[in-house]
C-alpha cells in the first residue's frame, strides 16, 4: 500500500459519519469531476488521493460509492454555514441576488439535486431550515455534482431570512403544496 497509511484509511472511513465530519471540519468528495471542482473552487482542499497511486483495492475500502472512483479528496468545510442571528443572515444575503429558501428537506439526494438545479438556474445562494439534511452528507455532496462549490448554502431560521430580506427591500415569493395558481 503506497501513498496512504492505515491511519488515513481509518480517518477517511470515519468521515462517512456526521460526528467525525463535524469534529474535523472537513468532508469528502469523490470522482474526477468533483475533485477537479473542489480544486478550482475557493474551498481549501486538504489532500487528494488517486486510484493509480493507492490501488483499486484501497480505493474500494475508502469510498462511499458502490464502485471505487478514480479520485477522492478531503475538503475543509466553509465556516459560515450555520447562521443564528439576523445580522449574519443580512450579511449572507448581501446587497442583491436571487436566493432559494428550503423548508426541512430530509432526503440527501433531493437536497443535492436541488443545489445542482439551483446552480444551473443561476441562484446565488440557498437558505435552509436548520433541521434540513446535512449539506456535507456524502449523498448530498455527490448529488450536487460539483454545484456545492458554486452555490452558497446557509442554515438559518426562515423567519430570520424573511425579516432580513424584507428590511433590505427584497421581494419574497413562496410556493405551497396546497396553494392556488396565480
PLM feature segments, named:
Residues 1-50, 132-133:
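Boundary-proximal intrinsically disordered activation/regulatory segments immediately upstream
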Residues 22, 41, 68, 168-169:
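Structured helix-beta-strand junction loops
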Residues 37-38, 62, 144:
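Residues that scaffold the ATP/ADP-binding catalytic core of kinase and kinase-like folds
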Residues 53-78:
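Glycine/small-residue-rich loop that forms an oxyanion/phosphate-binding "nest" at active or ligand-binding sites
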Residues 74-90:
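Glycine-/acidic-rich phosphate or pyrophosphate-binding loops and their flanking alpha/beta elements
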Residues 85-86, 90-179:
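RNA substrate-binding interface of SAM-dependent RNA methyltransferases
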Residues 182:
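Short clusters of hydrophobic/aromatic residues that line enzyme substrate/ligand-binding pockets
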